[in-house]
Amino acid sequence: FLYYFGLSFAGLSAIIDIDENKEIIFGDELTIDHIVWMGTQPTLKEKSERVGIRETLPSAGIISYLHKAVQKGQTVHYLPPYRPEHKLKLMDWLGVPPARQEGSVPFIRAVVAQRNYKSAEEIAEIEKACDVTADMHIKAMEVIRPGMYEYEVVAEMNRVAEMNNCELSFPTIATINGQTLHNHYHGNKIKSGDLFLIDAGAELPSGYCGDMSS
């Protein structure tokens, strides 16, 4: 969603309507309850206009929009869903049972072809993410000492990410028990002679990520 529409907020859906030559973002504006906790925020329409999308509709509007498209005989393309709630939404929106939601092969191929190409701006973002990721690993090498706990090393790595306005690409693996795949426990004490495995990465606000092992 972020790649095609430039927004990263929960509860949004979008349609690229090729026949009508327009893009629509579906979502609900913040209520007073949200504003009390979060303060005044740009409206969904304002956020959408910043990324070049002029038309917004409430979340519920996507159902009638898709139903009309199906009635007109338009082909509705979608990517294979992997989250169960999205499978249920597609069943509600298009009447396609979860077992038959295989996605559109032409759409899949089009997305793959597009994502294989990287613009100069994208490459710069990827390089930034990799630079911050490398700095995280270097910091771990600089601070690690026998007697430290794994979580102390992880804290230093997280600090590097935060200092560069980055989130983590995924939960950090930093462990003396590298023989266990995807070990996210950080409570072991590091001893002299231990082999310390790190798999970690930084994610930029743009969504581009680094992923390195050391």
Regions found by a protein language model. Name each.
Residues 1-135:
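A composition/biophysics-driven feature that prefers long, compositionally simple stretches
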Residues 118-142, 148-165, 170:
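Active-site pocket-lining segments that scaffold enzyme catalytic pockets across diverse folds
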Residues 41-44, 143, 200-201:
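Short, charged/polar low-complexity linear motifs in solvent-exposed/disordered segments
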Residues 1, 105-110, 148-214:
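Short catalytic-site patches enriched in acidic/histidine residues
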